[in-house]
Amino acid sequence: MANFFPRWTNYLPLKIVFCLCVLGGAASFVYWYYLTPEYMRMGYKPVQPVPFSHDIHVTQLGMDCRYCHSYVEVSSQSNIPTTQTCMNCHQQVQASNPKLTAIKESWESGKPVNWLRVHQVPDFAYFNHAVHVNRGISCVSCHGQVNHMDVVYQHESQTMGWCLNCHRHPENNLRPVSQVFNLDWKPDGGQSQQQIGLNLKQQWDINPPQNCAGCHR
């Protein structure tokens, strides 16, 4: 009987299986590398030079976020507190606590404490803290319940898709401006978050940008 197919076709099924395995492995690697929480830094919790507890300072002592992050309402970036801010209290309070060694050394040398950054805006992206907090977006929406954290960690993925989801549905995060820094605020009066958010969205004529130029400048 005549052989209608060339000899190389005998290996065709094996080649197809090999290509499928390579493609499957590549797809698994891309998913693991780009879409897992580890890649997006979720849960990233570096050990800081000073073991600062937001739970103690905010929840237990009642300090306002703006005492330390004093530029958050007027600047695109929320500042890390200076050593002077820390020493306003700690010249008297817990002055001999060894956990404050890095603060004291900074105070004496004039060199800033080498705090480790937790939340990092992606490259080529623009984010303005003042615009958000002055239009009813609380710290909690991006940073989680920081007021209950002993050690700050990255709570959200902060990817482009995550940002766009909020820009498409801002009502899920809007709250009265007076409650932006009340990190334990919950809707009251029988209204849901969506009802309050939709009312504020209409009242303030909020229409967040969804085009590229909104965040990539």
Label every model-predicted segment:
Residues P46-L100, N128-R217:
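Sequence context surrounding c-type heme c attachment/ligation sites in exported
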Residues G43, P49-P51, P112-N114, F124-Y126:
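Residue-level preference for alpha-helix termini and adjacent loops
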